[in-house]
A protein has these predicted regions:
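Interdomain/boundary linker segments immediately adjacent to catalytic/signaling cores
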Residues: 1-51
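Catalytic centers of nucleases
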Residues: 29-107
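Helix N-terminus capping/helix-initiation residues
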Residues: 96, 120, 159, 205-207, ...
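A recognition module on extended beta-rich or small alphabeta surfaces enriched in W/G with H and D/E
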Residues: 98-151
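Cytosolic-side membrane-insertion boundary helix
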Residues: 145-217
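Small-residue-rich hydrophobic membrane-insertion segments
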Residues: 190-306, 312, 330-383
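Membrane-helix boundary/interface segments in integral membrane proteins
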Residues: 309-329
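Cytosolic/matrix-facing juxtamembrane and C-terminal tails of multi-pass cellular membrane proteins
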Residues: 325, 384-388
Length: 388
């Protein structure tokens, strides 16, 4: 007979805490990737709302099933910001329609030949009128029909004011945007947690029904935790404190990455890792930048994950439900699980990619993450057991 939900779920059997810590660590890789796809480092600048508009509109397109390539992140002059289903789009979000359209002109001529010009949703009609005038004045090379303005101007999915708010922390527009950004990481955490928890429950003799219930609970916890910490990290990175933290992390990790790149083994490992992270072949300085960027953002994300997952134990400590020693052990184990999960996932993804690109990358990342996270977490607990 299968055991009931609730039986054997203590620390001596299910080890669900170890799984949760590890899954949070593995999921942080997905959360970091979601964060790195945004141009948050530029949100605080004078044109920060423009970069936020690019990110928000690109995300909207992705979530509506369109194929999006954010080619503009390399800041090439007069290049498209993104390519959507093969169509090049340049985004201009200024205070009014005249300024938004004028930003696409240089020396009196339209400088984005063959591209669509995306403007704030609330400026669309006025922008079309202005573009008609520009075409009539011969300022759009290769276009003579004013009615073509409707083919050139694209209505953005957000207003100018919404873009301004998305670039800032602490408001509903930016929080909703971050929730959408972290949806992928949340889904990943839910699926991984469900699978791991179900297998663990079945291995302990639980019935199929009870194992499903247990797995569903764990999936909800992991998904919710990943979503909350991911959003919190993105909100933090919009603040002065968050940017300073990221800058310190960059200064700390870049010399280490550069030193590793100077050795043959380090260069090979980091180049392969960078290629997996970037989703394309990169080398040299580009690989160094990819790794540094990933480590920088992950330091912030993992710190938020660690703090968030440590809150329950902190509350229990303050209420006298656990001892200081238990708190120290749980906290250290938590940190090891999160960090080990991320490190294991990164290493596993590289190995999996080498064996079977695509599927191997995903499977390797999951297996490596679980192994690394649980190994690190149990290692810390073993160390603490020596002092009992």
């Amino acid at each position: 007979m299968g055991r009931k939900d609730g039986e054997n779920l203590n620390s001596n059997t299910m080890k669900s805490r170890d799984f949760n810590e590890t899954i949070n660590g593995v999921a942080s890789t997905a959360s970091t990737e979601c964060t790195n796809q945004q141009q948050w480092t530029k949100y605080h600048s004078k044109q920060g709302h423009g970069f936020a508009a690019e990110d928000a509109n690109a995300l909207w397109d992705k979530m509506h099933g369109k194929r999006v390539d954010k080619v503009g992140m390399d800041n090439s002059k007069n290049g498209a910001d993104r390519i959507v289903n093969g169509v090049e789009i340049q985004t201009k979000y200024c205070a009014n329609a005249t300024k938004s359209v004028d930003a696409a002109f240089e020396n009196g001529q339209f400088r984005y030949s063959g591209m669509k010009l995306e403007v704030p949703k609330d400026q669309y009609e006025e922008a079309i009128r202005i573009m008609r005038e520009r075409i009539g004045q011969g300022k759009v090379p290769g276009v003579t029909d004013p009615n073509m303005a409707e083919q050139i101007i694209v209505k953005g999915h957000y207003t100018y004011d919404e873009a301004v708010r998305i670039a800032k922390a602490g408001n509903m527009d930016s929080i909703k945007f971050d929730i959408k950004t972290q949806a992928v990481a949340c889904t990943f955490a839910c699926g991984l947690s469900f699978a791991v928890s179900y297998c663990a429950a079945k291995s302990k003799g639980m019935s199929h029904t009870d194992a499903l219930k247990f797995a569903a609970k764990q999936a909800a916890k992991s998904g919710g935790s990943t979503l909350i910490t991911g959003v919190a990290a993105q909100q933090l990175l919009r603040t002065h404190v968050g940017r300073n933290f990221a800058a310190i992390a960059t200064k700390a990790v870049k010399p280490i990455v550069c030193s590793a790149m100077n050795t043959e083994v380090g260069k090979n490992v980091l180049t392969k890792t960078a290629s997996v992270i970037a989703g394309k072949q990169v080398a040299g300085v580009a690989a160094t930048n990819v790794i540094t960027k990933a480590l920088r953002t992950n330091a912030v994300v993992n710190t938020v994950v660690f703090v968030g997952t440590s809150i329950p134990d902190t509350v229990r400590l303050c209420c006298g439900k656990i001892t200081g020693r238990e708190y120290a052990e749980n906290t250290a184990s938590n940190a090891a699980g999160v960090g080990g999960g991320w490190a294991g996932a990164s290493a596993g993804a590289v190995i999996g990619s080498a064996v079977f690109p695509g599927v191997g990358t995903i499977v390797g990342g999951i297996i490596g993450g679980i192994g690394g996270g649980i190994g690190a977490s149990l290692g810390v607990k073993k160390m603490f057991s020596f002092f009992k």
